[in-house]
Amino acid sequence: MSAADTTAGVGLTDLEAAAQHWQEHGWVLVDGLVPTADIDHAVEELWDLYPHPDEFHADDPAVRDRFVGSSFNQGHKFPKADAEGAAFRPKQFLGHILFPYTSPRLNRLQVHPNVTAFARLAMGIDDIRIYQARIWGKYTGVTNYEQPFHQDRNHNVVPDRLEPGWWNLEGFLYLSEVEPDVAPTEIAGGPADTSRPYDGPPEGERFSAAGGRGSYLAYRPDVWHRGVDLTRPGGSRFLMSASFKPAGADWMGYDNVQPVTVGRPWITFAAACSPEELALFGAPLPGHPYWTPELVDALERRYPGIDATPWRDALA
């Protein structure tokens, strides 16, 4: 399926149409949601976190060891699998680095206004939280990345309520060109049997979510999808997870920033945030009864350089 086939939800540029497609079909690939200049500016710092593809594919064992050692790897929960066929393999989940990053530019990209605006538009609500924030890097040859079709039911402790006001939006922002031979996510099209939602993917066309850097793949947890293998020699693929839920939806979650908010990467990030950006992580907005003059003073001490004017003005 071509990335230009907008009738399938791949490569849409009109945000209203893209939001409607997500609401009706559960997924959409928004082409160029973030300008490539913004992506490229941030990706200059990506190689402080990951080996450059040229370096990685030079077959230096020390470089591969660095990649493995710096990854937040969830693959331990999956059993070993045979080399052939679609399966969840431990090494598929190498390459995760959790937010906040040591890169200020990538941290700012995590809350890019175009992404948060689209999430609000698609979800149909303004008060949202970012609950999954990480980068995922893959390189050809690390493992067989071919997965079976699956749904992401591990974002919720109760069954998903797939209705306006209740649904969450999962998303991948493309940091690199995600072409057909570097593992674009595959989506199972066709109407799902909502009476038996976990029985398997629907019969219908399969869509490859190939797209350019700056594109954003948004999907819901009921969508059947899978990872595919990287087949390009010397290939790589980098995505930024940016997933959102309604404020107050404590039953949904994935990544938690509170334990790292005393570290330098978060402090630097938070000091540059607007109230609305901090609210994506649960911080009370100006005017919330949580705030007192003393707490606003403490906010300035905790995040040197933050513009606390909105919080202070709201106390007046």
Regions found by a protein language model. Name each.
Residues 117, 142-210, 251-257:
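Catalytic core of non-heme Fe(II) oxygenases with the double-stranded beta-helix
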Residues 3, 52, 56, 223-224, ...:
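Non-heme Fe(II)/2-oxoglutarate
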Residues 206, 213-214, 235-239:
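Active-site lining segments that contact anionic ligands and/or coordinate catalytic metals
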